[in-house]
């Protein structure tokens, strides 16, 4: 198949690298130029491979710098590829390593990077959306509760807001009441003024000022706790004395007024008449003795207040002072304030929903940044697997040149050429290979064939990769479930909060008195009339699920399919490494082929020993197979019912030597039951290696059967 693929390019290769090109300078220059162009192409591919994984564009802020680095890298790669033979081999081996174990590891790292940037990153995005929904719902709930609380608490808040104005009005009302009490206090306690001074024009301002000072004094005294109250008897006696003095003062005031009237009349009369006649006519005005007469009786008897003032006036007045003290105590310095108990707890409870949500969001963003940094570092570490491909390629190149046994099990055209030449010379040849040798060597004409070791490795790698598929599938499934859950929540959780109504509170206080006025002043702030008509929705709080594009899933599936193909056919692709090295070092390849040919010849001289050794290694596997394989157990336990399953691969026995599947030519030992294929039985000279019994195939065994039996006994 390889020759079929390379056949179209064979004329070009012969033209450039044929024997006739060795002496042509023109062809050699053309060969150099073609090699340089191929180096440029490979350099471009290497750059893309490196830039894809290490994101080198991020290292260069300026786009022109990135372009210069790219050009320099490609030119240097093309030049070295043209000049250095080892570099050519290593660069080509790097691209072959992409399809080998290192390449698979690299592609697995890329696939895991897809998982990180796809489902895992999407889980983080959706987690952020859940955080946003939580914050939004918290704010919405807070606002709804706050609206309802404000509506309920508005009378109290209005009262607190207008309390200062109400306090001033109440204080003014208290002052008006105190002004009424000042006159009464003056009449009871401070009316004992001298008779000749009471009522003069000069004393009237003193009286008014005394009233104001008394008012301030009473307020101050009340504010300071007040003075000691008088006894009822003292009040009774003082008020009666004041009433008596006031009565006498009124009588004296009448006497003075009478004298003033006579005096003024006489003056006017003498003014209007001549002096000779005035005395005769105006003499009646000189008779002011009338003013001296006690027309109403004895003043002490008339001004006696005992019959007028009640006997319990003192007690009533003292009770009035007590009531005033209780009513106006600290009324002049009213201060409305409140105190929060357990202030720290109150502050924590009064924290708004916006601050809580912002703190939650900041904490989530901080954790998200840490997660992204960790995932970024992990992704860069995975990208370092590309360096492993370079290391593996160089290692293969070194071992190919230094270790003649390394990767040397191919039956090539030159191998067949040597074997045919030996046949023509009638010397022992190798081809065709024996049955037990076919599983150890690969014929390059059958490019898809594998050795037994390669088949085992492929199965193990497929099982290992299956675990990675399960892990990736779990991440994808979890992401899909989260997205579906968020979409269901968005579809079925939309709520519209509609509030329509009227909230009215009215306090009606009847009465015209001072207390009714005070109550109306205090309680009018509790009156409220609010019409509520609000419509709120949680639409903004519904989650917006972040869905991965289908393109990502297609790319991931395609990548996994490529990895599976590479695992299954990795051995086929890796054989290109030998082809590349043999192309550049064909003499070394001839040495390796001749070494392989001679090694097979040497092994055939000891073939019997190798056959028995392989059979002993396979014996344990055969016994386990007999116990574990249910189909084999059914086939041999119930041959009548399940004999038909012998036609299927899973119910067939394998040869003890070459592990080939059972066919019609198989020979089974009659003593121990070990199976052998026809070729391996012939190589063993028809003698069972386990028990030494001759294998019956319709013909007698050769003389070498005794040799096999003796070898078994010695072992």
From Swiss-Prot:
Residues 1-32, 88-109, 395-457, 575-715 are cytoplasmic. Residues 54-66, 131-373, 479-553 are extracellular. One of its GO terms (molecular function) is zinc ion binding. Specifically expressed in testis. It is found in: Cytoplasmic vesicle, Secretory vesicle, Acrosome membrane; Cytoplasm; Cytoplasmic vesicle membrane. A zinc finger (RING-type) spans 655-691. Keywords: Cytoplasm, Cytoplasmic vesicle, Fertilization, Membrane, Metal-binding, Transmembrane, Transmembrane helix, Zinc, Zinc-finger. The chain crosses the membrane at residues 33-53, 67-87, 110-130, 374-394, 458-478, 554-574. The keyword Disulfide bond does not apply. GO terms for biological process: sperm DNA decondensation; sperm plasma membrane disassembly. GO terms for cellular component: acrosomal membrane; acrosomal vesicle. It is a multi-pass membrane protein. Its main location: membrane. Component of the sperm acrosome membrane. Required for breakdown of the sperm plasma membrane after sperm entry into the egg, which is an essential prerequisite for successful fertilization. This is Protein sneaky. It comes from Drosophila melanogaster (Fruit fly).
